[in-house]
Design a protein with these regions (language model features):
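His/Asp/Glu-enriched, well-ordered alpha-helical/loop segment
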Residues: 1-104, 109-117
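Extracellular/periplasmic ectodomains of large secreted or surface enzymes and adhesion receptors
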Residues: 124-140
Length: 140
């Protein structure tokens, strides 16, 4: 029996959402999960087996499942899940373009910056230089 019937459920119109499953998996990062949804392979390289390849989804669908669908499942679609006027200004900046790297590298993506409610909460570039996290403008 196929495991993680994501594509079957998605095509049937089910509201499919996904999470990292941390602490069951090695990291809370969503990127290995997104990679696995597309490749149907273990993103940690413990196995070369492709599990139920017919249940794979494409990268845009995997991202939608983690973002918009997550907001719908959590009943916050008016404020979260996508970048739109009137919604919370929550977003991240990544170290690479997900659509320009091999799908098998998506699990290795790193977040460079996290912005929540329009305020920088994490800036890897600033923290690596010993600078402030980006909260210099306290007037916001």
């Amino acid at each position: 029996m196929p495991a993680w019937r994501i594509n079957t459920l998605y095509r049937a119109g089910a509201l499919v959402s996904y999470g990292s499953d941390w602490p069951v998996v090695p990291t809370a990062s969503p990127w290995p999960g997104i990679e696995a949804m597309v490749t149907r392979m273990d993103p940690y390289g413990r196995s070369d087996r492709v599990d139920s390849p017919g249940e794979a989804v494409d990268l845009p669908t995997a991202i939608r499942i983690f973002t918009r669908n997550g907001a719908l499942v959590n009943k916050v679609p008016d404020s979260s899940g996508s970048l739109e006027a009137g919604k919370d200004a929550d977003f991240i900046v990544l170290d690479r373009n997900l659509f320009e790297v091999p799908i098998t590298e998506v699990g290795d993506v790193q977040v460079l910056m996290s912005v929540v409610g329009g305020k920088v909460l994490f800036d890897k570039r600033a923290s690596s230089t010993g600078a402030d996290r980006g909260d210099a403008d306290e007037s916001q």
